[in-house]
């Protein structure tokens, strides 16, 4: 694939076809787990790993699997990737794994993962498929972290609490107390309805930016079209 194609894959994963903000996939973990940055980052990294692994293996076997058993084969690959990721989390971030709980195995049912395997990896070579999985996973993780940051800030008044669950004891000092000890915690932000509102605001912001960019692009096209139609006239007109 050309560089232009890789740029397109990146743009789609991070923005124009973002699994959370555009496709609205994976909303269950997005709403349930994103109560803090550390939870969101943990689930986001796990989902990213599963996407890269599953896309890569689906691409490798795409010509050996018939259409009749395509989807069951993809689900088995995804389940294997989730199991490997789950074992890694148990080994290195056990406390975070206990907090995320059931939502790690539920990555198997995330439509974003199966959708990329079927729509992209089963039709493309290994490297583009791995890049697609990485970018889609990164786009999903960034939305998770953004939602988690807003909810944690509004709900507790601080950011980056409990980051030692991922990065070790040295990360305990990363916590930023933004609003101070007297901040009246907005508990609503930590509940699922608060997550719905934050996600809705992010979707609205993205749609507003897209509309603004489209308006500017249309205005630029109109200006170019008008300029090309101008005709210079010289001499007297009788």
Curated annotation (Swiss-Prot):
Keywords, sorted A to Z: Cell inner membrane, Cell membrane, Electron transport, Membrane, Translocase, Transmembrane, Transmembrane helix, Transport
Xref: Pfam families: Rnf-Nqr
GO cellular component terms, A-Z: plasma membrane
Protein's membrane topology: Multi-pass membrane protein
Annotated InterPro entries: NqrDE/RnfAE, RnfE
Compartment(s): Cell inner membrane
Transmembrane segments: 20-40, 41-61, 72-92, 95-115, 130-150, 185-205
Gene Ontology biological-process entries: electron transport chain
EC number: 7.-.-.-
Function (record text): Part of a membrane-bound complex that couples electron transfer with translocation of ions across the membrane.
NCBIfam families: PRK12405.1, rnfE
Quaternary context: The complex is composed of six subunits: RnfA, RnfB, RnfC, RnfD, RnfE and RnfG.
Similarity comment: family membership: Belongs to the NqrDE/RnfAE family.
Record protein name field: Ion-translocating oxidoreductase complex subunit E
Organism listed in the record: Cellvibrio japonicus (strain Ueda107)
Protein encoded by which gene: rnfE
